Amino acid sequence: MKTIKSLFTSTKPELLVTGFVFTEGPLWHPDDILYVSDVDAQVHYKVRLEQKVITEVIRDGSGGANGAVFDKDGCLVICEQDARRVVRYEPDGSITVLVDKYGDKRLNRSNDIILHPDGSLYFTDPDKKGLEESDKELGFASIFRINLDGDLVLLAKDMNHPNGLGFSVDGKTLYVSNSRPDPHLHAYSVDNSGMLNDSRIVAEMPYGNLGELSGVPDGLKLDAEGNIYVTGPGGIWVWDKYEEFLGVIELPELPANIGWGGTDNCTMFVTARTSVYTFKMTRPGIPKQF
């Protein structure tokens, strides 16, 4: 029988770098770099992995940069939750706004983003927490897709606070964490056109059930075997490919998001409040972008 410990070479996290305010959006690049956003400080950084030091500020005044992914052309794409938009960092250093409105209404607070195998981008736009009443325009929380032609498609609006998201190994299921007010792991089937159907709750994730650490479901990733990892109350919650709960790996700080990296894609990077931690895994993560 598979255990949660069999997925980690060690369940003790290794501190990579610290000194931030609120870390998010870990994204690995093969040039020995980890991109990390400090959401509250409004700064986006490069961390040099071998030296375990911050080597460069790539954007100061980052719009609350949160989830990040490389697009089909290898450009960095960021959800800027405070600026309420999704942007792409161009090779020349300029920034292109991919989307900031659905129709004539501004997005809520774009949160996390992933790349579909066809090159389109799926992202969550959760509820309006943090917005003044007068700034609320959409009236619902959403999961969107940015098509290759730039069109924005509404995929789902039946969750209260969709947050992290990830595709199953076969691409036929999209898993999404719901943060509040009913924290849980959610799932949709993905049809051949990339639309979402068969909305269902996989598992409830109650608030702060692990001693002094609280928190909500947040970042989400899967590995090549189909195991599901969600940052949540007290640590990283794990389910196997059959959606059976395996347990929780605790961290010194409350985690917010997860990223895969390393040449074998077997390193898990975890952003957790003031720090970034790593685990070495026994299965590679998906997708492998490089």
Set out the residue ranges of the language-model regions.
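Beta-rich, blade/repeat-based domains predominating
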Residues: K12, V17-I33, D60-E80, R85, ...
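A short loop-to-beta-strand structural motif that recurs across blades of beta-propeller domains
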Residues: V43-Y45, R85-V87, A141-F144, H184-H186, ...
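Short loop/turn segments immediately following beta-strands, especially the blade-tip
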Residues: Y188-M195, M281-K288
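Short, solvent-exposed loop/turn segments at conserved positions within beta-propeller repeat blades
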Residues: V39-D40, Q81-D82, K128-F140, S179-P183, ...
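Beta-propeller fold detector
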Residues: T55-D60, T96-D100, L154-K157, L196-E204, ...
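Beta-propeller domains
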Residues: L34-R59
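Blade/loop signatures of beta-propeller domains
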Residues: M1-T11, A41, E137, M195-L196, ...
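Residue-level marker for isolated small/hydroxyl-bearing positions within beta-strands
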Residues: S37, C79, T124, S177, ...
